[in-house]
Amino acid sequence: MRTFNDFSGLPADRPKLTARQAQILELIRNAIAQTGAPPTRAEIAAELGFRSPNAAEEHLKALAKKGVIELVSGTSRGIRLRTDSLQALNESRISQFSPPVQRLEQLTLPLVGRVAAGSPILAQEHIERTYFFESRLFEQQPDYLLKVRGMSMRDIGIMDGDLLAVKQAREAKNGQIVVARLGDEVTVKRFHRNQHLIELLSENPDFKPIVVQPGEPFELEGLAVGLIRGSLAM
């Protein structure tokens, strides 16, 4: 079992968490940072030694009640870290190793809307606006935000209108959430390479896998490193 830091002593203006709640919050954060998706209730139960996923569900409900996560009904991975709780969690980690007055740089992230065929994803005409975030909000520093369109990734909590934080990359590991360009379309999917074929997998049974055929125009644009709910970014 991986070790966890104790984040129960959050600042006074933040919800106070029990040690177990802090462990679960850190587990969620680690899973999103490493795989691009939150854990299932069963995975939380297995990681922390609970007898059943129901115990994990009760802790998640308590965290949601305290306002540090949001639960999306009807999906096994429907857990979202609220932006302010992610910041508090990172501030707690940083404060263990550096003076409270030390602050990290602010990130300037362009928001990419619709992408025209054949042009770079960060071309000026694609940028709708610019957002500013503390760099400590992200485990890996993103290069841009992409507005999610559609519900193909619904079951891991990525919804239409959300802003996906993306780090530019040309390679991906199986299971990572990627931004890919296939022909004239840019899409967010789970990456899987099977021998010589690449599959782009949805997280919604209503959407079939996309199989990239040999010779078909395909380009990996980046890896998902964070998610911001669209309503929080208004």
From Swiss-Prot:
It catalyses: Hydrolysis of Ala-|-Gly bond in repressor LexA. It is an enzyme of class 3 (hydrolase). The active site is at S152, K189. InterPro entries: LexA, LexA-like, LexA/Signal_pep-like_sf, LexA_DNA-bd_dom, LexA_repressor, Peptidase_S24_LexA, Peptidase_S24_S26A/B/C, WH-like_DNA-bd_sf. Keywords: Autocatalytic cleavage, DNA damage, DNA repair, DNA replication, DNA-binding, Hydrolase, Repressor, SOS response, Transcription, Transcription regulation. Its EC number is 3.4.21.88. One of its GO terms (biological process) is proteolysis. One of its GO terms (molecular function) is serine-type endopeptidase activity. The keyword Protein transport does not apply. The keyword Repressor applies. Residues 41-61 bind DNA. The record marks A117, G118 as: Cleavage. Gene3D superfamilies: Umud Fragment, subunit A, Winged helix-like DNA-binding domain superfamily/Winged helix DNA-binding domain. Represses a number of genes involved in the response to DNA damage (SOS response), including recA and lexA. In the presence of single-stranded DNA, RecA interacts with LexA causing an autocatalytic cleavage which disrupts the DNA-binding part of LexA, leading to derepression of the SOS regulon and eventually DNA repair. Homodimer. This is LexA repressor.
